[in-house]
Amino acid sequence: MRVKVDPREVAKEFADFSRRMQKGRELLDKTRDRDVQIATTPKREVFRRDKTVLYRYEPVAKKTVSVPVLVVYGLVGRYTMADLQEDRSLIRNLLAQGVDLYVVDWGTPTRGDRWLTLEDYIDDYLDACIGQVCRESGLDAISLLGICEGGVFTLCYAARRPERVKNLVLTITPVDFHANAKGAPPHHGLIGLWSRSLTSEDIDRLIEANGNLPGELMSFVFSLMTPVNALTKYNLGLFDVMDDEKKLLNFLRMEKWLQDRPDHPGEAAKQWLKDLYQENQLVKGEFRLGGEKV
């Protein structure tokens, strides 16, 4: 099969490519860290225990909801995803609606946190943060917004301490960890497929070798959900946006969040992978915290 190539079109495409490359180089050259800051919504620290910090956001509108909302993200990422940038921010949207908003920051676990369990995070740190919000609001119960792994934390907490939870909202939260086992598209539930491909001893060796579950490893596993994008985003994907400053900064902010995935404390990671992903104990009613069924 012959392909006709118009030299004039080739020259035009090459000139356009060169122009975009030059514009992209200029934009990258002038971009500074302050231009790609994330989680910039004003807030103040109101409570701290070990590395866990509770923040309260500054109100921007008249309060329309009497019950404050505590946002709880997981340990496999950072809460900053909920406040990525001014025009793409769950936090700013909730504040604009008059919600009294708090967020939990789990900090950056190190090898010194290797022995922390899910009980430590749910029954101690999360419980302490909820207690602080209750004290500040003068209420006995508050609303919880759980995101990803944080949704499992809040779900377990609500099941064990229902008197402290007025409303529970979950988003992108796994409950049936084997829901993808049959009939789901290949890219759905990849973390579950990966974790179930490991033996219990594999997980033990992984944690013992590293102390924690490495954030870099989880970033790689997540990237396998969209392998083509993972291979092309730094060439084709970046090229598509590099001459548009707004799109380029959006791209860089997302990459900044993706590359800042903290390690997951070792013992808590064992529970997360074994009890939940491998054995699906939560939906079976077999999951235990502190020796008690959730």
Label every PLM stretch briefly.
Residues D113-W115, A181:
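Conserved catalytic-core motifs of eukaryotic protein kinase domains, centered on the activation segment
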Residues M1-E13, R135, L139, T154-E267:
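Alpha/beta-hydrolase-fold enzymes
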Residues L27-T52, L238-V294:
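Alpha/beta-hydrolase fold catalytic core
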Residues R32, A39-T110:
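Short, surface-exposed "cap/lid" segments of acyl-processing enzymes
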Residues L145-G150, T154:
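Gly/Ala-rich beta-loop-alpha elbow adjacent to hydrolase catalytic centers
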Residues W115-E136:
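Alpha/beta-hydrolase active-site loop
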Residues M1-A39:
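N-terminal targeting or regulatory segments adjacent to alpha/beta-hydrolase or S9 domains
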